[in-house]
């Protein structure tokens, strides 16, 4: 797997989160999961990297309209993080499965 650095992952994730904040219905679309999975090739990725600073940057995308602000926070807090965690777990399992298969192939080819 070609590794992508954490800043690329963070930026891609912010684009996805921004889209979700603007249209929460995207949250239920399969294309969103695909877009997020494409961002998760960095094996050092940790779901906790969405800290206060990144949250502030995400909120800066939102207009000053208080209702829009509340809607965005609701989507981020109650929808996005569990979804991210689930996708990360799924991706990590895919990575583990792929690596174990690769290791077994390598040991077979190398004669043990």
Swiss-Prot record:
This is 87 kDa annexin-binding protein. Binds annexin. It comes from the Eukaryota.
């Amino acid at each position: 797997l070609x590794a992508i650095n954490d800043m690329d992952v963070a930026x891609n994730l912010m684009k996805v989160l921004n889209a979700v904040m603007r249209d929460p219905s995207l949250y239920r679309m399969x294309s969103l999961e695909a877009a997020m999975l494409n961002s998760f090739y960095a094996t050092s990725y940790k779901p906790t990297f969405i800290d206060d600073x990144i949250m502030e940057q995400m909120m800066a995308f939102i207009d000053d309209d208080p209702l829009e602000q509340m809607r965005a926070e609701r989507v981020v807090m109650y929808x996005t993080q569990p979804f991210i965690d689930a996708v990360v777990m799924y991706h990590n399992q895919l990575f583990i499965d792929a690596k174990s298969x690769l290791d077994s192939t390598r040991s077979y080819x190398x004669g043990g």
